[in-house]
Amino acid sequence: MEPGLDAAIVALGGNDMLRGIAPEVVRTNMIGILEVIKEANIPLMIVGSYAPNNYGSDYKEDFDRIFPELAQDYDALYLSSLFDPFIINGGLNRNMSQFFQADGLHPNAEWVTKIIDSIGPVFLELIEATSQK
C-alpha cells in the first residue's frame, strides 16, 4: 500500500461471488487486504455485496455476512451494497437494465449518480474520520 494515504475504501467481492468462489476464500482474501490497511492505521470504509438466491441459501447466507462482520471486526464504516438504491422489498428492482452499460454488468452514468447519493453520507463520515486522525 502506498504510504501517506488518508483513508481506504474496500469495495470488493462482487466478481468473486459471480465466479462462485467459496465465501470462506473471499473472507480470507478480504482479511489479507484489511490487515494491511489496519497496519497503516487509517480510517476504513467497507462496501459490501450480496449473493443472489440462485447460489443456494447456504452460500447466500455465508457470503452476505462477510462484509458486515468484517466491518465490525475492523471498526470500519460500512455500506451494505452499491445496489442499495435499487433494492425494493428485499429484491432488486426489475427495471434495472436502464442503469447498466452495454456489458450488462457495470453501472451507467445515471446509476453512478444514484451510487454517489447513496454512498455520500458514509463517505462524509470517512472524511470526518480522516480529519480527526
Task: State what each model feature region is.
Residues M1-K133:
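Alpha-helical cap/lid subdomain in secreted, periplasmic
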